[in-house]
UniProtKB/Swiss-Prot annotation:
Keyword Nucleotide-binding: yes
Modified residues (O-di-AMP-tyrosine): 83
Species assigned in the record: Methanocaldococcus jannaschii (strain ATCC 43067 / DSM 2661 / JAL-1 / JCM 10045 / NBRC 100440)
Motif interval(s): RX(4)HXY motif: 76-83
Sequence similarity: Belongs to the HepT RNase toxin family.
Name of this protein: Putative RNase MJ0127
Stretch forming the signal peptide: none
EC number: 3.1.-.-
Entry keyword annotation includes Kinase: no
Amino acid sequence: MPKKDVRAFLYDILENMKDIIDFTNDMTFDEFLKDKKTQKAVIRSLEVIGEAVKNLPEDFINKYPQVPWKGMARLRDKLIHHYFGINYEIIWDIVINKVPNDIKEIEEIIKDIEGEDENSI
């Protein structure tokens, strides 16, 4: 897969992660539980992230093992198919404890890829 295509998926992932942070900014877990619109927006963004991850080539995923790619893809499957319902405590934990770090990792990967492109000119 050309780097351009990989980059498009990475930008999709990054945009949706940043959206999740924006949607839940200054929100408590109790507020999140009461706000169906935010729940649905966060769930949809997590689904899009998982779908984008599924489109990344295996060799690319293996090159960046610091990102929980497979977990993102599995979460998408669970959300899409609603296996055993949605546990909003787990979703909130992902929002608060995983997404901010994943944003940093994805930004670093994008810089890495763009640096490779500059070096190949």
